[in-house]
Amino acid sequence: MSATTTAARPGTAGAGAFTSIGRLDALDWALPLVPRDRRGAARAVLAFRAEVQAVADGAAPRPEKRGRLAAWRLELDALEAGLPATPVTIALQQPLHRHRLPRTELENLVLAADMDAGGVMVAPPQCDLRLYTRRSGGALIILLAAVLGDTSHAAGCFGLALGEAMRLTTLLRDLGPAARAGRLCLPRESLAEAGIVAASTAEVLDHPALDAACAPVAATASERFADARLMLPEVALPARPFLRAVLEAHEDLLETLHARGRGAAVQPPPSPGRVALAARVLRHRFRGAA
């Protein structure tokens, strides 16, 4: 089977599989804040992220998942050469050149999915968690900032801060369903400090010290949100409304998770309130880039 054929069938999350990005989230709701002539490019980036993550989240055997993700990396080579073979990469062809999307960040999205597919994200060391959030969250925000016209060093630093904070927050949000599917984003250092020793990822959810293990992750997310807020004025004006809305929506989510405490891991993950998100989009649309 050729690489492009494999990439054309990346696989989706099968029945009962954990899907980490399947539902509508703040990124989707904030899309109206992206200028109309750039919105298609933003959707193409989000679609690529969804395609590769669907491979990791699917029910296929681990070697098959990793093979498909390797094929996606070859497909990025084809995209760069002007020969994309999948609907997603065809949609990325014009944005790649028009908005100078960094190929390395597209590849980082694939590498993050490979960490999921390869079983790395089960009580990973702190260094691996940091690498994962950089590849999955940082890469995504850097790509979206590029779509919005800012490929500067300042935008890159902002993207790393917001991407890490955003991804840590969504990992905490999805802690329950992920653990029941055999994943656990909490770093092993935090689990050890909290005194959690469990035979399975699902058992961690019932441990009375779960809040203590989550606290350092939440604290890091909060610190990185603060970093992103300080850096936002350095980002190009046209990019700010969308990025500010995404930042604030995920900050609100982190506060919701903190209020729910240990219950956040055993209850259905909270989704952003549609009315609140719509109001935020309208507020930022009228507020503009100020």
Which stretches of residues belong to each language-model region?
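Catalytic cores of Mg2+-dependent Asp-rich isoprenoid enzymes
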Residues: 1-166, 172, 176-290
